[in-house]
Design a protein with these regions (language model features):
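Acidic, polar-rich low-complexity tracts and alpha-helical solenoid repeat scaffolds
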Residues: 1-193
Length: 193
C-alpha cells in the first residue's frame, strides 16, 4: 500500500510497530520523501541496533539527512556508518559522502574558514584511505576548490589591512600569503600591494 497522505505519515509516526515504521521509512526513501524517511529512520534506528537491518537503516538515514541538507548530522551519521561497518560494500561511498558533507558546510570565503580547513582534512583522509576510488577525482577537485577559497580569504585579509592603511600588517600578511600560496593567481596583485 502506498503512503500518500499527511494523515498516513502522522499515523505511522505515532505507531509503536517498529516493522511497520521500517517499511514506511523505506517507502518514503524510495519515493525521495527525505524528511519523512529521516524522521522514521531516526525513530527506529536504536531499536535495530545490532540487528542485520541496522547497516541499511544507518546508511539510508544518513543519506536522507544529506538530501534534506542537514550536512552536520549527515556527516556524523556517515562517519558512524564507516566505523560500524568498515567492511560494508557501502563503506567507501559513506566515507566519501561524509567528507562531501563537510565540504557542503564550508562557508563563503568572506567568513571564518575553520569548516573549510576541516573539510579539506576530511577529503584528504578519504583520498589517502581510498586511493583507487572512483570518487578520487571528485574529492581532489573539491579539495582544490576549498584551497582556492582559503587563498581568497588570505588575500582579502591582506587587502583589508592595506585599505585601512595598516601598511606594515598588509606587507606581513601579503608576504606570508605569497609564501603560503606560491602558485596563486593573486600573486601579481599581492606583490602590487
Amino acid at each position: 500500500r502506498q503512503l500518500t497522505s499527511c494523515n498516513d505519515y502522522q499515523k505511522i509516526l505515532r505507531n509503536e510497530d517498529t516493522a511497520a515504521k521500517y517499511k514506511a521509512a523505506e517507502e518514503y526513501y524510495e519515493n525521495e520523501e527525505w524528511r519523512r524517511a529521516s524522521n522514521l529512520f531516526e525513530q527506529i534506528s536504536p531499536k535495530y541496533r545490532g540487528r542485520p537491518q541496522a547497516e541499511r537503516i544507518t546508511f539510508f538515514y544518513a543519506s536522507s539527512l544529506l538530501n534534506i541538507k542537514n550536512y552536520l548530522t549527515a556527516a556524523y551519521k556517515f562517519e558512524e556508518f564507516v566505523k560500524a561497518y568498515p567492511l560494508s560494500q557501502k563503506a567507501e561511498e559513506a566515507a566519501y559522502l561524509a567528507a562531501f558533507c563537510y565540504y557542503k558546510q564550508s562557508p563563503v570565503h568572506t567568513l571564518t574558514q575553520e569548516k573549510t580547513i576541516e573539510a579539506i582534512e576530511k577529503l584528504q583522509e578519504f583520498i589517502n584511505f581510498y586511493p583507487n576510488s572512483e570518487k578520487l577525482s571528485n574529492a581532489s577537485d573539491l579539495v582544490q576548490e576549498l584551497r582556492v577559497k582559503l587563498e581568497e580569504k588570505a588575500f582579502e585579509i591582506g587587502k583589508q589591512y592595506n585599505k585601512i592603511r595598516d601598511y606594515k600588517s598588509a606587507i606581513i600578511v601579503l608576504n606570508s600569503f605569497i609564501s603560503d600560496y606560491p602558485g596563486t593567481p593573486y600573486r601579481e596583485d599581492a606583490l602590487f600591494f
